A protein has these predicted regions:
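Juxtamembrane extracytoplasmic/periplasmic/luminal helical "stalk" adjacent to the first N-terminal
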Residues: 1-73
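Short amphipathic alpha-helical segments
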Residues: 35, 39, 84-92, 198
Length: 199
């Protein structure tokens, strides 16, 4: 009877050992594949951020942008209106090749102009309250995060209301320096939407 039980246990133990080894190999392969996938995704994201950095640096050094930062809010029919529209069109030509799901924004702090791919808006608070509202932060918090930075920063994924539509996005924020104290006078922003990250 004992030899019969041993005859049953030995093949069972052998099969269990094979199963355990196969399971461990499968898990190891799965973990390695996952690490490789995540490494490739991270490298791709880093490369994308580097391309945004390159575009932002070029734009921050643009002489037309520097001139635009000095313009005050124009009255209707002033010649300055033409300059603003022309600059908006130049921006569109420079940045229109960026994925349409991303969206670009050039936000000037002193004169409160906001250039987007669709329009030019005047008034930072108006823009925040009516056209691009971050649900989890106030206008003052947004202003501080946007303009009190010296380096490029990525704001965490947040729900943003853009023209009445909800979007989950990371905000890329690159400071435009100027003035005597070389402080942040404006920013270049891109919205990196959740859908882009999930693709």
């Amino acid at each position: 009877f004992v030899s019969y039980i041993i005859m049953l246990i030995l093949p069972g133990a052998f099969i269990w050992k094979l199963y355990d080894k196969a399971y461990n190999l499968t898990m190891e392969n799965y973990i390695n594949d996952s690490i490789n996938f995540l490494s490739q995704a991270a490298a791709g994201f880093d490369k994308y951020i580097e391309s945004l950095d390159e575009r932002s640096v070029r734009l921050a050094c643009d002489t037309n942008l520097k001139a635009m930062m000095k313009i005050r809010k124009p009255q209707p029919a002033e010649s300055t209106v033409y300059n603003i529209v022309r600059f908006s069109n130049e921006l569109y030509e420079k940045l229109s090749y960026i994925d349409k799901n991303m969206g670009y924004f050039v936000i000037l702090g002193d004169n409160e102009f906001i250039f987007t791919e669709n329009t030019v808006v005047y008034g930072l608070k108006y823009y925040f309250d009516n056209l691009r509202t971050y649900q989890s932060i106030t206008y003052d918090e947004w202003y501080e995060q946007v303009f009190y930075t010296n380096n490029r920063i990525l704001f965490p994924m947040r729900t943003i209301q853009i023209n009445g539509k909800s979007v989950d996005a990371i905000t890329y924020n690159y400071p435009i320096k100027g003035g005597n104290n070389w402080s942040t006078k404006g920013v270049v922003q891109f919205l990196i939407r959740r859908e882009y990250l999930e693709d």
